[in-house]
Amino acid sequence: AGGIAEMAELGPEVRKKTDKLDAVGNTTAAVAKGFAIGSAALTALALFTAFAEEVVKSPGVSSALHGSHFVLNLLEPKIIIGLFIGGTVPFLFCAFAMEAVGKAAFEMIGEVRRQFREIPGLMEGKAKPDYARCVDISTRAAIRQMIAPGLLAVITPLIVGFGFGAQALGGMLAGVTVAGVLLAIFMANAGGAWDHA
């Protein structure tokens, strides 16, 4: 609302009201991030429990069982390998996602500069920009750049599970859960601090 009021050149009293709305919106978003992280952590734990229950039912995984329970023995090398792989996946995913945002932004900047160069009267406000082209670039870039993070999330468990077995996959899921929750809390707090600095 503040940006719209600024572009529409509305009076300072309107800007005061939109600033209050902006502050409330930022606070609400910051609080909601905590709830979102908490619900994601609980969902990950529920999925890990479902995985453990399925492993118990599956034939050929007796080495991972302790009685009728699925156990992750930290002295087992495959589990350590899985933990380290799982611990790196959230960081790789975030790196791919941040790189995607940067690439999409630079594509948009290139298009905006092209329009300023090629559309006469755009700088003076006498001509309209090609909004559809900008929307098309941002949509295509968003979809194209998120292929790598999506493939990482889908392919990694398959490689670990088929390559190293159920124990390594359990270790990977545990590593992803712990590292992912901690990284989410860190990034939410850091982003909130930078946003309100």
UniProtKB/Swiss-Prot annotation:
Primary subcellular site in the record, as a coarse category: membrane
Disulfide bond annotation, renumbered to this chain: none
InterPro entries registered for this protein in UniProt: PPase-energised_H-pump
Keywords: Cell membrane, Ion transport, Magnesium, Membrane, Potassium, Sodium, Sodium transport, Translocase, Transmembrane, Transmembrane helix, Transport
Residue numbers marked as site, Determinant of potassium dependence: A29
Regulation: Requires K(+) for maximal activity.
GO biological process: one example: sodium ion transport
Cofactors: Mg(2+)
The UniProt record lists the keyword RNA-binding: no
Compartments (UniProt record): Cell membrane
Record's keyword annotation contains Disulfide bond: no
GO molecular function, one term: inorganic diphosphate phosphatase activity
Stored Pfam families: H_PPase
Membrane-spanning intervals of the chain: 31-51, 79-99, 146-166, 168-188
Cellular component, GO annotation: plasma membrane
Membrane topology per record: Multi-pass membrane protein
Enzyme Commission (EC) number: 7.2.3.1
Reaction(s) catalysed (UniProt annotation): Na(+)(in) + diphosphate + H2O = Na(+)(out) + 2 phosphate + H(+)
Subunit structure: Homodimer.
Family according to the record: Belongs to the H(+)-translocating pyrophosphatase (TC 3.A.10) family. K(+)-stimulated subfamily.
PANTHER family found in the cross-reference section: K(+)-INSENSITIVE PYROPHOSPHATE-ENERGIZED PROTON PUMP
Identification of the protein by name: Putative K(+)-stimulated pyrophosphate-energized sodium pump
Protein source organism: Heliobacterium chlorum
Protein encoded by which gene: hppA
